[in-house]
Amino acid sequence: MLFHITHTHTPETCPYHDPEKAKATFGKVMSGAEQLGVKLVGAWVDAPAHTVYIVVDTDSVQKIEALLAPAFEIGHAETRPVSDAAAVIQRVTG
């Protein structure tokens, strides 16, 4: 199942100018997906807005919680299940 994650943080907690914080937060998120059984479909950042967008494929919300745990202290995340738009259109239109 696909999930779209939006993580936001403040300028004060931003890891952009702190390489150690970057490794300890999003570095661990990006490198830990496979070990947790989560497929990282893609990740994008809007640095000026302090927002990270991640799409994952997994069968468990608990795996998403474990994946995001390194970034919990610097901000918050919203997780939404999503579907492939082309597949939905095909299903609806036959």
Locate each region found by the language model.
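Short S/T/G/P-rich N-terminal loop/turn motif that feeds into the first structured element of a domain
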Residues: 1-35, 39-41, 45-50, 62, ...
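Short hydrophobic/aromatic beta-strand micro-patches
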Residues: 8, 55-57
